[in-house]
C-alpha cells in the first residue's frame, strides 16, 4: 500500500490522474464502508442528501470528518494513501486538508459538472492532490469519475459551479450562499465547455473501479461524475492531501470548512498548522 512505480508517477505528472488497482486492503475498505453507511443516518456538520427533495435516489455527501470522528482520522492514517500522495507529488511531507464521503444510490440523477478543485479550496500549490478510494464497484454507467487528461498543465483555472446551483447567475448563487461569491465567480473568465462532446480536442478518460481501487488526481485536473444509472449504490471516500509547497490561500468562494479564523496561518504561509492540517506522512 502507498507504493507507486516510476511509470505510474510519470503518468500522474503527464495526465494529472492515475488509476491504482487494489491500493487499499479489503478489510479496511469494509470497515470504512460500515462507517460511511452509519453517516447516512447520523451525518456530520457538513453532511446530507444533496438531491432535490422530489428527485429520485440519494446523493449523500459528508466532509471534514477527521477532526470529530476518531475512526475517520484512523482511516486517513492507516490507508497508506498519504505515502502514495507523497510519491506522486515528490513531497517529503503530506498533510491532510479534509476527507470527503460520496454515496450515490441507483437512479440518482444528480451529478457533478466539470470542475477543478482548486477554486473551491483555501490552499494553493503544485503538490496538492486527492485520492478517491472506491468502496463499491463503479463504472461509467454508475457514476464513475471522468477526467480531462493533462488539464492540470493548462495553467488555467475555470469558473467554479456550486452543488445544486449549477448554471445559475452569480448573483443568485450569492443569495443562496454568502456575500462576495458573485464577484468571486465572475473573476474567472474561463467557463468549462462540455469536454466530452469534443473528443478531437480533449482527452476524456474514465476508469472502471473495484472496492480498494484508488484514483489519484491533481487538484487542478478537470473532472466530473454523472448520474448513477446502474443497479447498485456507488460509495467512495476522498482524502485531500497537501504536499511540501502547499500554502494557505483563503478565498471568498472557498469551502468554509476551514476559515481564516480557524488557523494561525497568514495568507501565503506554507501549511504548518499541525492542529488544523495534521501531518499524516513524513520522510
For each predicted feature, which ranges?
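Short, conserved beta-strand element in jelly-roll/cupin
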Residues: 115, 122-140, 208-211, 216, ...
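A short secondary-structure junction signal
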Residues: 108, 113-114, 125, 141-147, ...
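Glycine-rich phosphate/pyrophosphate-binding beta-alpha loops
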Residues: 117-119, 128, 223-228
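Non-heme Fe(II)/2-oxoglutarate
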Residues: 46-51, 161-163, 211-216, 220-283
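Non-heme Fe(II)-dependent double-stranded beta-helix
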Residues: 1-15, 21-114, 119-122, 252, ...
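Double-stranded beta-helix
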Residues: 140-221
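Short, charged/polar surface micro-motifs in flexible loops or helix N-caps
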Residues: 81, 91, 106-108, 138-140, ...
Amino acid at each position: 500500500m502507498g507504493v507507486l512505480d516510476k511509470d505510474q508517477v510519470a503518468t500522474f505528472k503527464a495526465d494529472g490522474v492515475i488509476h491504482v488497482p487494489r491500493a487499499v486492503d479489503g478489510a479496511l475498505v469494509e470497515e470504512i464502508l460500515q462507517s460511511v453507511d452509519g453517516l447516512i443516518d447520523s451525518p456530520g456538520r457538513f453532511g446530507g442528501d444533496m438531491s432535490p427533495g422530489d428527485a429520485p435516489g440519494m446523493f449523500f455527501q459528508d466532509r471534514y470528518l477527521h477532526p470529530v470522528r476518531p475512526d475517520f482520522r484512523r482511516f486517513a492514517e492507516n490507508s497508506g494513501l498519504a505515502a502514495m500522495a507523497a510519491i506522486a507529488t515528490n513531497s517529503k511531507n503530506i498533510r491532510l486538508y479534509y476527507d470527503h464521503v460520496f454515496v450515490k444510490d441507483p437512479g440518482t440523477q444528480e451529478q457533478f459538472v466539470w470542475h477543478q478543485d482548486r477554486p473551491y479550496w483555501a490552499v494553493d500549490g503544485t503538490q496538492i492532490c486527492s485520492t478517491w478510494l472506491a468502496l463499491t464497484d463503479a463504472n461509467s454507467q454508475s457514476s464513475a469519475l471522468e477526467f480531462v487528461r493533462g488539464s492540470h498543465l493548462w495553467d488555467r483555472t475555470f469558473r467554479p459551479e456550486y452543488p445544486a446551483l449549477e448554471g445559475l447567475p452569480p448573483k443568485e448563487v450569492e443569495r443562496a450562499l454568502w456575500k462576495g461569491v458573485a464577484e468571486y465567480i465572475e473573476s474567472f473568465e474561463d467557463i468549462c465547455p462540455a469536454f466530452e462532446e469534443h473528443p478531437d480536442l480533449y482527452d476524456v478518460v474514465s476508469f472502471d473501479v473495484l472496492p480498494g481501487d484508488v484514483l489519484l488526481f491533481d487538484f487542478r485536473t478537470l473532472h466530473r461524475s454523472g448520474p448513477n444509472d446502474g443497479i447498485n449504490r456507488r460509495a467512495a471516500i476522498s482524502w485531500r492531501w497537501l504536499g511540501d509547497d502547499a500554502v494557505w490561500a483563503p478565498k471568498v468562494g472557498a469551502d468554509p470548512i476551514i476559515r481564516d479564523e480557524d488557523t494561525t496561518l497568514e495568507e501565503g504561509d506554507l501549511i504548518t498548522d499541525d492542529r488544523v492540517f495534521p501531518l499524516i506522512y513524513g520522510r
